[in-house]
Amino acid sequence: MIGRLRGIVAYKAPPWLVVDVNGVGYELEAPMSTFYDLPELGREVTLYTHYSQKEDSVSLYGFLREGERRLFRDVQKVSGIGAKIALAVLSGVTVEEFARMVQAGDITALTRIPGIGKKTAERMVLELRDRAAQFGAGGALPTGSGPAPADPLSDATVALQQLGYKPAEAARMAREAFNEGDEVAIVIRKALQSALR
């Protein structure tokens, strides 16, 4: 339905962003992998999108790389996995790292991603192993880096909670990852990388 958007970044606070396309603001939910590389507010961006309509909601998801959108869609084909876990996957690891985990059958590494337990990880390996090599295909669209938000520590805590971490755990992870002057995307990236170790 809506496959791609090109417009101006009008708002961004993980996991939400608004892209202004000729005066219409499209609100999208995006994984941290996209937020890491978004241009600053007021700059142009092109996003691959995934439109989802359910009985009680309509959602639009945005991705800088086609491979991320493909992985988002494929992960949701696994029984018991929805958009929230698919976003957590893309927020926790790169497409290439996920493909390696699935191809290697690394259940332990997969269970470090929020929302994925042992049985879900086993289903992912079983159902996605044949397609894992295709996940990395699809390049990035050109982008810049964004400015630091007013309070990167609290924004990172909120983003980690939305990825499935409990409030106390999200706050601890953000505090441990935070260094003065860090942008919110950097804090979240360091927190997620630390959690996966």
Curated annotation (Swiss-Prot):
The keyword DNA-binding belongs to this UniProt entry's keyword annotation: yes
Entry's localization field: Cytoplasm
An example Gene Ontology biological process: DNA repair
Any matching Pfam family: HHH_5
Region: Domain II, residue numbers: 65-143
Keywords: Cytoplasm, DNA damage, DNA recombination, DNA repair, DNA-binding
Region (Domain I): 1-64
A cellular-component GO term for this protein: Holliday junction resolvase complex
Main location: cytoplasm
SMART domains named in the record: HhH1 (SM00278)
Stretches the record annotates as Domain III: 153-197
Region (Flexible linker) location: 144-153
Role of this protein: The RuvA-RuvB-RuvC complex processes Holliday junction (HJ) DNA during genetic recombination and DNA repair, while the RuvA-RuvB complex plays an important role in the rescue of blocked DNA replication forks via replication fork reversal (RFR). RuvA specifically binds to HJ cruciform DNA, conferring on it an open structure. The RuvB hexamer acts as an ATP-dependent pump, pulling dsDNA into and through the RuvAB complex. HJ branch migration allows RuvC to scan DNA until it finds its consensus sequence, where it cleaves and resolves the cruciform DNA.
Oligomeric and partner information: Homotetramer. Forms an RuvA(8)-RuvB(12)-Holliday junction (HJ) complex. HJ DNA is sandwiched between 2 RuvA tetramers; dsDNA enters through RuvA and exits via RuvB. An RuvB hexamer assembles on each DNA strand where it exits the tetramer. Each RuvB hexamer is contacted by two RuvA subunits (via domain III) on 2 adjacent RuvB subunits; this complex drives branch migration. In the full resolvosome a probable DNA-RuvA(4)-RuvB(12)-RuvC(2) complex forms which resolves the HJ.
Assigned protein family: Belongs to the RuvA family.
Domain notes: Has three domains with a flexible linker between the domains II and III and assumes an 'L' shape. Domain III is highly mobile and contacts RuvB.
UniProt-listed HAMAP family: DNA_HJ_migration_RuvA
UniProt protein name: Holliday junction branch migration complex subunit RuvA
Source organism of the structure: Stenotrophomonas maltophilia (strain R551-3)
Gene from which this protein is expressed: ruvA
